[in-house]
Structure formats: structure tokens, C-alpha cells
């Protein structure tokens, strides 16, 4: 058998596309979550880390194969490969979403989940009351919590960020 000698853990950054640091320099590349390559929208990270590591390795292999040095200019090949991959395309698609969620986190992580949960309960509740009353009460709870303008604003900002 084996015995565990050490445990390790770390926080996973979720800054998104706009938080990606410099990915390469003279003699170095950054991959995975160290490069902020996490897609918080789709809860992806491991696949992005593996793909970025693979691409960094391929870039380094190509540079070494032609006798090149690990200069910033040569290692820019890694950034180009990453830019053509699904990794950057997906992160770019949702580039504005992290800032929206961080700016208005209480509504997106507390208010809306609570309202949606209550609406779902109201929708399936069998209590003998006319559903029109339940639907009006549910709509009123959303308006009371966020106002009509707040709901419209959140919907538009979400749609723009989600594009």
C-alpha cells in the first residue's frame, strides 16, 4: 500500500480573459490557472490547463527542433497557437462576464437564485389557488427585489456580456 505524506491545494483564479497576464518571455511560458486560463462560466479549468500545457510544449519543441533559442520572440509562437485554439476563443467570448458578476455579485449570486428558487416552488405548488395569482405574486417579487429598471438593466448587461 501507500501512505499520503502531503496535501496541497490552492485557490483557482477566475479573472477571465481580461486578467490573463503576459504568457511568455525570455526563457519562460505560463500555462493553466497560473495564466488565468479558467472559464468560470462553464466551470472549466483542467482542460484549459492541459491544452495550454500541450501547446506550450509543442511550441518549445518546434523552436528547439529548428535550433532556436527560448527568446520572447520565438516563444510568441505559443501565444499564436493558443489564440487559434478553443481556449482563447471561449475565454474571449465571455470576456465581459466576470466583471459583470463581480460588480453586481449580490444580485447575481444571492437575489436572483433566491427569486428563481421561490418562483420554481410556486410554479409546481399544488395549493388550490388560481395560478394567475401565483404568477402575479412571483412577478411582483422580482420587481420588488430589483425594480423593473433593475431587471431590464441586468438582462441587457447579461446579454451583452454573454454574447
Curated annotation (Swiss-Prot):
Its cofactor is FAD. Keywords: FAD, Flavoprotein, Nitrogen fixation, Oxidoreductase, Plasmid. One of its GO terms (biological process) is nitrogen fixation. The keyword Flavoprotein applies. One of its GO terms (molecular function) is oxidoreductase activity. The keyword Oxidoreductase applies. It comes from the Bacteria. Belongs to the ETF-QO/FixC family. Could be required for the formation of a functional nitrogenase Fe protein. Probably accepts electrons from FixA/FixB and reduces a quinone. This is Protein FixC. It comes from Rhizobium leguminosarum. The lineage of its organism: Bacteria, Pseudomonadati, Pseudomonadota, Alphaproteobacteria, Hyphomicrobiales.
Amino acid at each position: 500500500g501507500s501512505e499520503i505524506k502531503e496535501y496541497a491545494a490552492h485557490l483557482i483564479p477566475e479573472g477571465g480573459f481580461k486578467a490573463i497576464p503576459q504568457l511568455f518571455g525570455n526563457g519562460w511560458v505560463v500555462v493553466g490557472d497560473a495564466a488565468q486560463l479558467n472559464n468560470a462560466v462553464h466551470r472549466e479549468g483542467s482542460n484549459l490547463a492541459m491544452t495550454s500545457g500541450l501547446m506550450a510544449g509543442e511550441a518549445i519543441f518546434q523552436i528547439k527542433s529548428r535550433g532556436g533559442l527560448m527568446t520572447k520572440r520565438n516563444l510568441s509562437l505559443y501565444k499564436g497557437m493558443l489564440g487559434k485554439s478553443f481556449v482563447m476563443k471561449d475565454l474571449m467570448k465571455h470576456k465581459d462576464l466576470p466583471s459583470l458578476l463581480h460588480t453586481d455579485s449580490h444580485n447575481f449570486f444571492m437575489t436572483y437564485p433566491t427569486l428563481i428558487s421561490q418562483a420554481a416552488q410556486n410554479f409546481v405548488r399544488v395549493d388550490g389557488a388560481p395560478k394567475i395569482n401565483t404568477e402575479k405574486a412571483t412577478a411582483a417579487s422580482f420587481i420588488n427585489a430589483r425594480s423593473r429598471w433593475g431587471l431590464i438593466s441586468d438582462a441587457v448587461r447579461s446579454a451583452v456580456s454573454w454574447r
